[in-house]
Swiss-Prot record:
Region (Disordered): 169-194
Top-level taxonomy: Bacteria, Pseudomonadati, Pseudomonadota, Alphaproteobacteria, Hyphomicrobiales
Role description: Binds to the 23S rRNA.
Gene3D superfamilies documented for this protein: Ribosomal protein L9, C-terminal domain, Ribosomal protein L9, N-terminal domain
Keywords: Ribonucleoprotein, Ribosomal protein, RNA-binding, rRNA-binding
Example of a GO cellular component annotation carried by this entry: ribonucleoprotein complex
Protein's UniProt name: Large ribosomal subunit protein bL9
Similarity comment: family membership: Belongs to the bacterial ribosomal protein bL9 family.
GO molecular-function terms, A-Z: rRNA binding; structural constituent of ribosome
Example GO biological process: translation
């Protein structure tokens, strides 16, 4: 199906372009979201009549997104999650979780705007891209940790996936790797085996 784009759509084209897309993509996404019109003569005339209005609306949305991007760019957000000693999360941090975190901080971000290839499954610092507008993209840092104290330590550059990093000096000496029993070591005990 051929459609006329009413705004810039990534990987398709700019506003006003006539592009050929699959029927399902047009029917289920582009047309209901108001991002495109079917490419026929009546709609082409309608688009040309509204072009200036659409461009002004697009420019207004872009300037609003740019203002939010200035406030958001480079900011760091902390997500506290439970995780194992190796840093593996019990669960994951998805686009929905990130959107809720940003909304709680006062930024209006939809989960569809967060560009994340796969959910985050380990603790640490992660850069996340957010598309506030098709032409405005911003990157924020997500600090995923077990506690707020750990998040501060991670922000300073510490790696928190070892037992010493997690427990500090409180770790039991017998739990240190060098004190583990080695079954291949020579036994030099006081007992004689006959």
């Amino acid at each position: 199906m051929e459609v006329i784009l009413l705004e810039r759509v990534s990987r398709l084209g700019q506003m006003g372009d006539t592009v050929k897309v699959k029927d399902g993509f047009a029917r289920n996404f582009l047309l209901p979201q108001g991002k495109a019109l079917r490419a026929n003569e009546a709609n082409k005339k309608k688009f040309e009549g509204q072009r200036a209005q659409l461009e002004a609306r697009n420019l207004e949305r872009k300037s609003e997104a740019s203002q939010v991007a200035e406030k958001l760019d480079g900011k760091s957000f902390i997500a506290v999650r439970s995780a194992g000693e190796t840093g593996q999360l019990y669960g994951s941090v998805s686009t929905r979780d990130i959107a809720e975190l940003l909304t709680a901080e006062g930024f209006s971000v939809n989960r569809n705007q967060i560009l994340l290839n796969q959910p985050i499954k380990t603790i640490g610092l992660t850069n996340v891209a957010i598309a506030l507008h098709p032409e405005v993209e911003v990157t924020v840092t997500l600090n995923i940790a077990r506690t707020a104290d750990e998040a501060e330590r991670q922000a300073k550059g510490e790696t928190l996936t070892t037992a010493e990093a997690i427990y500090g000096d409180d770790i039991n000496d017998n739990a240190r790797p060098e004190n583990f029993f080695d079954p291949n070591a020579e036994f030099d005990g006081g007992e004689d085996n006959a």
